[in-house]
A protein has these predicted regions:
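N-terminal subdomain of nucleotide-sugar transferases
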Residues: 1-54, 82
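Extended catalytic core of nucleotide-activated donor transferases of GT-like folds
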Residues: 40, 53-98
Length: 98
């Protein structure tokens, strides 16, 4: 199974999010939970592929792949190109509910 997880990390790309098990590094609750999901899912289901779709390259948790997308409108095409089976998207984008 290939899981894709999207996060708009534009405002937190400079924050070290490599080890979220140590706690929230001050990135906000939703962002923390989304990135923690990617990290923990990969830890427990190491045979599954995890791709993080992000707005900016950053200091991110260890997963199989990172794909930079140009906004949420770019996400479906990139996810399809990466052959993602399940795509997780936060219900909030730039502070606005989807």
């Amino acid at each position: 199974m290939h899981i894709g997880i999207y996060i708009n990390n534009e405002n937190i790309s400079s924050v070290d999010c490599k080890n979220l098990l140590a706690g929230n590094p001050g990135i906000g609750g939703t962002e923390y939970c989304v990135l923690l999901l990617a990290q923990v899912y990969k830890m427990y289901y190491s045979n599954n592929k995890v791709t993080l779709f992000v707005a900016k390259q950053g200091i991110l948790p260890e997963v199989d792949n990172y794909v930079v997308v140009n906004g949420i409108d770019d996400l479906p095409a990139k996810a399809q190109k990466e052959d993602v089976d399940v795509l997780v998207v936060s219900a909030v984008y730039n502070g606005i509910p989807l």
